């Protein structure tokens, strides 16, 4: 529930009671999501607090990034550093994704988009590709009820060619289950590439022009945006990449045109909601000019 101080509104959830359930306990895999009290008075359930019991920093509503995009990088390196197979890093990243979802709700973010599998990832070994596709399917199946209880709206974003039908099926079920939720919208980018998205939009517009449905001279940015995978995804405010790498990697090229970039050194399996909050605090200190002086 948002609080008001003076003329400013703070959307952060208040600190949880000390005995409120915590997450994540990484001693087992899959990481177990704790039982949390059901929401009351038509509200959704409050997310479990972090195991550290840290609370989200107070940031005024007009300074909280509305849309945060995250490149979840470093799973393979995390596993290699520990003498494990790359897939073990991906497994440990599942709990981090759920944890930052909880943290995003606590701090007041309304849109979260995560890069789970790129169109370039098909170049990886057949074994890893098969694992990642199956893993995405199982994560959605395993976590959608927990996320639904917290008011999360789940959506898949990506290209259909080459995408496993079984993965699309699980996303479709999750989207139908959560379609009316309004606490936060999470876009899971699987088989997604920014250039591919733009090319597919251009192709659709070109076909409409050939069919005489539109005048090419009247094509605008707004018209183009309507042909992207999800026309209602807002522009990215904060773009986060973990693992210390500093590049966009073909992610949300159109939507992130004016995003603020924060690069954090932690590998994804070591990341948690406190790191997300730190990125939000850095975002607050940025001067967004949008081309103005």
Swiss-Prot record:
One BP annotation, GO: polyprenol biosynthetic process
- EC id: 2.5.1.86, 2.5.1.87
One Pfam match: Prenyltransf
Going by the record, the broad EC class of this enzyme is: transferase
Residue sites binding Mg(2+) per the record: 73, 260
Q: Which UniProt keywords apply?
A: Cell membrane, Magnesium, Membrane, Metal-binding, Transferase
Q: What is its main location?
A: membrane
Give the reactions, separated by semicolons, that this protein catalyses: (2Z,6E)-farnesyl diphosphate + 7 isopentenyl diphosphate = (2Z,6Z,10Z,14Z,18Z,22Z,26Z,30Z,34E)-decaprenyl diphosphate + 7 diphosphate; n isopentenyl diphosphate + (2E,6E)-farnesyl diphosphate = a di-trans,poly-cis-polyprenyl diphosphate + n diphosphate
Where in this protein does the record put region Disordered?
A: 1-24
Cofactor(s) this protein cannot do without: Mg(2+)
Query: Coiled-coil regions in this chain?
Result: none
One annotated GO molecular function is:
manganese ion binding
Q: Which amino acid positions bind substrate, per UniProt?
A: 74-78, 86, 90, 118-120, 122, 124, 241, 247-249
Q: Name one GO cellular component term.
A: plasma membrane
* Residues at the active site: 73, 121 (proton acceptor)
UniProt similarity note: Belongs to the UPP synthase family.
Query: Which PANTHER family does its entry note?
Result: DEHYDRODOLICHYL DIPHOSPHATE SYNTHASE 2, DEHYDRODOLICHYL DIPHOSPHATE SYNTHASE FAMILY MEMBER
HAMAP family from the entry? ISPT
**What does the subunit comment say?**
Homodimer.
- Write down what this protein is called: Decaprenyl diphosphate synthase
